[in-house]
Amino acid sequence: MNIEDVVLKYALANAVKYGGRADVKAVMAKIMAEVPDLRPRAREVRQLVEAVVAKVNSMQPEEQLRLLRERWPEALEERRVEQRRPGIESLPELPNVRGGVVVRFAPNPDFVLHLGSARPAILNYAYRMRYGGRFILRFEDTDPRTKRPLVSDEVNAYEAIREDLRWLGVRWDEEHIQSRRMEIYYDHARMLLSMGAAYVDLCRPEEWRRLRNAGRACPHRGQSPEEALELWDRMLRGDFGEGEAVVRIKTDLSHPDPSVRDWVAFRVIDTSKTPHPLTGDRYVVWPTYNFAVSIDDHLMGVTHVLRAQEHSVNTVKQSYVFKHFGWEQPVTIHFGRLRIEGASLSKSKLKALRVRYDDVSLPTLAGLRSRGILPEAIWELILTVGIKPSDTTVALSNLFALNRKRVEPAANRYMFVTEPVKLVFESDRELVAKIPLHPSYRERGERVYKLGPGRVEVYVSSRDVRPGAVVRLMELANVEVLEVGGGAARGRLHSLELEAARRVGAPIVQWVADPVEVRVVKPVAVGKKVEEVGLGERALEAVEEGAYLQFFRYGFVKKVGRLDFVYVHD
């Protein structure tokens, strides 16, 4: 393969993967990694890459994909080996599977993904893994006014969604961005107008609603294709303002659901006031969700659509586009809404909280990742719920239980004391505490503390001591509390054996000697968290960042800084 072909191959592969736009740096990195012999010629190669990338980016995404399939089909198969996940085989069979399947996950990038968004992503990808085929990531971003894509200094929703999917272990075979496919939608609008299957409506919105609700035709419905195309061209030129002209698909004016009757396919959006973050004010006529989806599902070869029950009426609306063009509509399966008990998954409500999208108190995927929830736990939750048509409500505690069984074996145990007070007592002997890192994995080792003889000072929680009570200092000794006050407590050595503590009903409490100050961020509600400051073992300084631990009688935590932790769950 000559150098020109090498560059073209990787430029096409990069463009197909990322929505029709190849990146010079990414293509260069791939070439230098795959063909190291070219490194001495890096400057020459870069000039060629820049030229080829410009040429590739001028192509329509369909042309890029076609050329890549024709010349280098193996590039489409260069994917990491996918691990079969438990639970996939328990999903019901899909109807009308002919070989593999082509499925899609189509988020609106007006916000990041949350736990509810993970459901269609995982279910569609699970069937892609089960049957083989293609999984398409498609950004549906054709409403720059009411559902404006989120691109700001804080977050780029396009990239955040990609990052969330990678973290989930969802890998896409190709990517498309609808706002970069406008000419494709325009071409198909022109076809429908030429066929008499659509028309340009100039009625005032209130007049249209009156006619629609009465099941009567708009006076513009009978316009000739020539008249419709002339009005269409005027729309594209910007002759109409918002609400003055729309393109409608001809449906059934007697349909029992008024929203299905001649629904809007295109409308005018003044992008000089609400520019699109990717295309600016280049376009003023924008396709609606149902039109763009219909065209894309056909052109991308989608065979099966798995989506929420709330889209059932959209399936009906889209059927008219398929009928007008004589296309076969994908098999569509609707599943019920996933609700999280005590946690809203509404995008608008999550946005209104005014906290970072990756805050540990949010049920966004980024927030759950920051908190320490593992993607495998989310997979198990979603596959357990499955594709039931009825709504499902689960508690976050269900997700936490699935996560707990995964982090528990790895989480070494440490002592952490909140609201600490110093407990002082005398001992006539040396006290030795041997605390295993994990009670079920003794081979990991233990920490040994030697205190006394003489004055012994340890820190315990103020909630664990009251005058007259006996407490069991974990793995150390039993101490009778004599007095408490002024941020300190005084006691006397009662006994050493665990059995003696049991006889007097002494609670086992954690304690810290030679402490360090520890901070734990703890989510308490959606959008709310508290910081708890306490004392922990000095051994925590040596724990690697990112490690999961269990603080005795407190819960599982994840280390995120030198002595900073995030509370994961109990």
Swiss-Prot record:
Q: What class of enzyme is it?
A: ligase
Query: Where in or outside the cell?
Result: Cytoplasm
Q: Which one GO biological process term can you cite for this protein?
A: glutamyl-tRNA aminoacylation
Protein biosynthesis among keywords: yes
- Chain positions of motif 'HIGH' region: 107-117
Q: Does the keyword Secreted apply?
A: no
Give GO cellular component annotations, separated by semicolons: cytosol
Catalysed reaction(s) here are:
tRNA(Glu) + L-glutamate + ATP = L-glutamyl-tRNA(Glu) + AMP + diphosphate
State which Enzyme Commission number(s) the record gives.
Answer: 6.1.1.17
Task: Output the Pfam families linked to this UniProt entry.
Answer: tRNA-synt_1c, tRNA-synt_1c_C
Give the UniProt keywords, A-Z: Aminoacyl-tRNA synthetase, ATP-binding, Cytoplasm, Ligase, Nucleotide-binding, Protein biosynthesis
GO terms, molecular function = ATP binding; glutamate-tRNA ligase activity
The entry's family comment says:
Belongs to the class-I aminoacyl-tRNA synthetase family. Glutamate--tRNA ligase type 2 subfamily.
Described purpose of this protein according to its UniProt entry: Catalyzes the attachment of glutamate to tRNA(Glu) in a two-step reaction: glutamate is first activated by ATP to form Glu-AMP and then transferred to the acceptor end of tRNA(Glu).
Specify the protein name. Glutamate--tRNA ligase
